[in-house]
Amino acid sequence: MPCGEDWLSHPLGIVQGFFAQNGVNPDWEKKVIEYFKEKLKENNAPKWVPSLNEVPLHYLKPNSFVKFRCMIQDMFDPEFYMGVYETVNQNTKAHVLHFGKYRDVAECGPQQELDLNSPRNTTLERQTFYCVPVPGESTWVKEAYVNANQARVSPSTSYTPSRHKRSYEDDDDMDLQPNKQKDQHAGARQAGSVGGLQWCGEPKRLETEASTGQQLNSLNLSSPFDLNFPLPGEKGPACLVKVYEDWDCFKVNDILELYGILSVDPVLSILNNDERDASALLDPMECTDTAEEQRVHSPPASLVPRIHVILAQKLQHINPLLPACLNKEESKTCKFVSSFMSELSPVRAELLGFLTHALLGDSLAAEYLILHLISTVYTRRDVLPLGKFTVNLSGCPRNSTFTEHLYRIIQHLVPASFRLQMTIENMNHLKFIPHKDYTANRLVSGLLQLPSNTSLVIDETLLEQGQLDTPGVHNVTALSNLITWQKVDYDFSYHQMEFPCNINVFITSEGRSLLPADCQIHLQPQLIPPNMEEYMNSLLSAVLPSVLNKFRIYLTLLRFLEYSISDEITKAVEDDFVEMRKNDPQSITADDLHQLLVVARCLSLSAGQTTLSRERWLRAKQLESLRRTRLQQQKCVNGNEL
């Protein structure tokens, strides 16, 4: 069995060792998974695995062991592949069994040929996910992962920087002149496809249903390949992820950490184009029908590498400062949580002061911003999401950079965020809702395809008079549904499919927001800096990195604390609410009680308390009273509704 760092540089050799020992006995697959699982438990082993998020693709060796932090953007149809196949040596007639798992290209000797009629060939199924880097991931998160990674990599001799930078058009240019490439793979790498597994053998073609493709000249070579990122300006690799076990556990928009084998073999581009040419000759009509689908589902490996997953973990969060799984009863995790909780009070006080300065001296608005940032949908009762707390910060100065810089502050605190500038042009032209493209058989992303716990900051101060067209109205409706029901209805043309979500929405506006919000707090600045950018920059630079990290841990950790209300406090709250209704029957409603309970929940958690106390309930009532009084005062000043 290979040892040392072979599991990192030559994982297929490890797999081959288990396969050779066990043959067709399926136990070898479990042993492979167990082997890599144990390897990753060794001291700091995950930090030695090169990450596609941090390491340029051209620095990674093909067929090496890699990891990838990503979101499932789409799920393709399951595909069949040859789990075990047999080859025959043309000279000696010797038969050899090979495994097809974790491979796109079957490696055969120059004298070997695939025996399609072998009774020992087995066809298995695997699932393909289209995965993209986590949308809106903050710069500080990326930097922390980069600094933690200890993988030693250098430019791959078989994968040069020029390949990495080549566009989709260049890939097709290469494929239009395949002789230069094919000469490198002559004999041992003649193209073929059986059951989803590309294979090499003698120079002859084998066509199956899986290889029915497209005409090369039907491609739109003038436009670059669309990596289908949900948010504009996103960078990083998209990957086709091949999953072999337990794929039913995952769903679209899940955040995953994957460990697997990288496949970037240039021969994949040659094979795909050969299949297009061959299928065009066999059935031009069928080829035309599937051209776009073939382009999307089989992009050049230099642009969209493949990862054959050995281990996959669904991530609760992407904050690199915390243990990956906070629900585990591991001593290390418990020790981390208890240690941080013991110093929670000063961290909260410092964070409140920091946000008070960011909100121009308004400590009440800072309190509500903290409550908003730690809120989360903890459960659903029928269609009602419980725990969400959308805040509308009204009174923001118009034609000012305040909202832009406030978003920068939030970016420095949360792991993932996006600022939506709510202009008429953006509302009318941006794609908010993901939709199904049946021609390409893929889910085309939209701005609202975001993973759980993303902070979405909607800036209404940029909104001017204008006309919303039909797409604009649909986009406003989508935002309203997201805020109210924490769901996005994806467009599948013939029907809509509901995707539940857990997005923290924070709205900045001059007057009352056009969108529904759980809570409106009117900003009362205590100071107006002459230079907003200079003020906010000095605020950020004054905070020590260690303190900033404590803020980040605080805001992520508190979302995952269990919370409950005792029977005694429940009875006290009910009695209190009845008394409030007696005193003010017109303005106190059941919705007000619900909001008070949400505020009390977040307030308790912000103090590290996992159960509601009488003291926190009274403090929640006090905060709500101050907020309502402020709104009434502002309404009297303006003479209109806020």
UniProtKB/Swiss-Prot annotation:
Residues 151-161 have a biased composition (Polar residues). Residues 151-197 are annotated as: Disordered. The modification Phosphoserine is found at S154, S167, S298. One of its GO terms (biological process) is sister chromatid cohesion. It is found in: Nucleus. InterPro entries: MCM_complex-bd (IPR019140). The keyword Cell cycle applies. Associated component of the MCM complex that acts as a regulator of DNA replication. Binds to the MCM complex during late S phase and promotes the disassembly of the MCM complex from chromatin, thereby acting as a key regulator of pre-replication complex (pre-RC) unloading from replicated DNA. Can dissociate the MCM complex without addition of ATP; probably acts by destabilizing interactions of each individual subunits of the MCM complex. Required for sister chromatid cohesion. Interacts with the MCM complex: associates with the MCM3-7 complex which lacks MCM2, while it does not interact with the MCM complex when MCM2 is present (MCM2-7 complex). Interacts with the RPA complex, when composed of all RPA1, RPA2 and RPA3 components, but not with RPA1 or RPA2 alone. Belongs to the MCMBP family. This is Mini-chromosome maintenance complex-binding protein.
